[in-house]
Amino acid sequence: MTAKDVKFGNDARVKMLAGVNVLADAVKVTLGPKGRNVILDKAFGAPTITKDGVSVAREIELEDKFENMGAQMVKEVASKANDAAGDGTTTATVLAQAIVSEGLKAVAAGMNPMDLKRGIDKAVNAVVEELKILSKPCETSKEIEQVGTISANADETVGKLIAQAMEKVGKEGVITVEDGSGLSDELDVVEGMQFDRGYLSPYFINKPEAATVELDNPFILLVDKKISNIRELLPVLEGVAKAGKPLLIIAEDVEGEALATLVVNTMRGIVKVAAVKAPGFGDRRKAMLQDIAILTAGTVISEEIGMELEKATLEDLGQAKRVVINKDNTTIIDGIGDEAQIKGRVAQIRQQIEEATSDYDKEKLQERVAKLAGGVAVIKVGAATEVEMKEKKDRVDDALHATRAAVEEGIVAGGGVALIRAATKVATTLKGDNEDQDVGIKLALRAMEAPLRQIVTNAGEEASVVASAVKNGEGNFGYNAGTEQYGDMIAMGILDPTKVTRSALQFAASIAGLMVTTECMVADLPKEEKADLTGGMGGMGGMGGMM
């Protein structure tokens, strides 16, 4: 076992704070409408330019082991905020830095770290409740556009694209972000259902340039079992060949002789077929097959209800206008299913969402609603260079997550104003159980000014003056760093999703609280390089003459 280096008390905390500051200072330059870029070196290819807090945080690794521990803890704050809300990573980092630095000062002044942490937790819980009261629902297309614009660093085109996409596919529809081919951004809306299963054999591909299978007006056979015997499929294949239409088979699996025969028939042009695995597993697969059946007016061939594949007829097959399959996804466009039945199915799944207990189940059910009720929107990001495209794609991704969060939990005034309003309200009523807890409450509430101060600093203004003016205001009154004007933040379209602000605060306080209560740090001692034993033998070369 390697020897350890152990630091205690103030020595440990000073090192930890140094690491926190290096990471947070690198991340916080990106905050706000006038935030700057950070360039990240890559082992291969061109450097990446980004304004995304979590992307910067992930790149930072410090040489000093103790400083690195502090940096990694704050990196965790950014990652957690990103996982929970998909945005707010820079805000979370700024909050964590503010709470840690204020907290460590209090510890150095002799306060009890555990009581400080309890005070911080009380303040954060009270502010989160206050944020919920301040929150208002985000419903109109204009509000969605404003949230997207703010999250994409004041890029209005991104906000507009996301608002259009949500309008087309509904708030629960599937929206993806891809690389575009031109200079401008584009929005493609795919009406239909997409699931994450690709073709079972590359020999089905009929569009080699795009490596996809495209079937026009196909029949769709839905089977809830593995197909390995071609004899079971023959009646359906003959019927489809007579009708002169292509066929898509969605089954638990197609293997062996059955798959080989389908491939041979396709290559010879006898019948145009493609096969994919059914999405999901177990009961979820059965439910998703039923969704596809309703969407395409087909029937799931299942032995559980006494149906056999050999006896299936063309009446049992679903139909759609078009099917596109690549190696990862299958998209069914314009199924001929009855509108009323589709709506009934959606209502049924929504009921299951209400009753679901686990978050995972809810998420999967939500996906099914999206696939049935909405469609698939693809935002294609255009840029002049690959470096610019990566940077822009990051911002569009952030904006997309932010708008989803806004639709989910509502919006509050942006620019750090909501935190200040909530903190001011809480400061008048919240009391701790002892003096040290009161100090914890005060320092946490003071730290909540940090995002506004940083936005103002990045805009080149005096943070204290602006923070004081905003604190003296009421309601949504705040400072628009983009135009350098004071006013009603919501009227100016500067909105933050409540979920993003809440998550940033909770994760920052959680990890900052742990760091404030740290008393000892342990790291491996650096290994000393052993001296090269051959180093002093250089003079031996002349011994050849002694023989």
Swiss-Prot record:
Residues recorded as binding ATP, renumbered to this chain, are 30-33, 51, 87-91, 415, 496
Source domain of life? Bacteria
> What is the protein's major site of localization?
cytoplasm
Q: Name one GO biological process term.
A: protein refolding
Q: Which InterPro entries match?
A: Chaperonin_Cpn60_CS (IPR018370), Cpn60/GroEL (IPR001844), Cpn60/GroEL/TCP-1 (IPR002423), GroEL-like_apical_dom_sf (IPR027409), GROEL-like_equatorial_sf (IPR027413), TCP-1-like_intermed_sf (IPR027410)
Q: Which GO terms describe its molecular function?
A: ATP binding; ATP-dependent protein folding chaperone; isomerase activity; unfolded protein binding
* Subcellular localization, as worded in the UniProt entry: Cytoplasm
Task: Return the GO cellular component terms, semicolon-separated.
Answer: cytoplasm
Q: What class of enzyme is it?
A: isomerase
Q: Which reaction does it catalyse?
A: ATP + H2O + a folded polypeptide = ADP + phosphate + an unfolded polypeptide
User: What keyword terms does UniProt attach to this protein?
Assistant: ATP-binding, Chaperone, Cytoplasm, Isomerase, Nucleotide-binding
Record's Pfam families?
Cpn60_TCP1 (PF00118)
What Enzyme Commission number(s) apply to this enzyme? 5.6.1.7
Q: How does it assemble?
A: Forms a cylinder of 14 subunits composed of two heptameric rings stacked back-to-back. Interacts with the co-chaperonin GroES.
Q: What does this protein do?
A: Together with its co-chaperonin GroES, plays an essential role in assisting protein folding. The GroEL-GroES system forms a nano-cage that allows encapsulation of the non-native substrate proteins and provides a physical environment optimized to promote and accelerate protein folding.
PANTHER family recorded:
60 KDA HEAT SHOCK PROTEIN, MITOCHONDRIAL (PTHR45633)
Please report which protein family the annotation says this sequence is part of: Belongs to the chaperonin (HSP60) family.
Q: What is this protein called?
A: Chaperonin GroEL
Name the species this protein comes from. Answer: Histophilus somni (strain 2336)
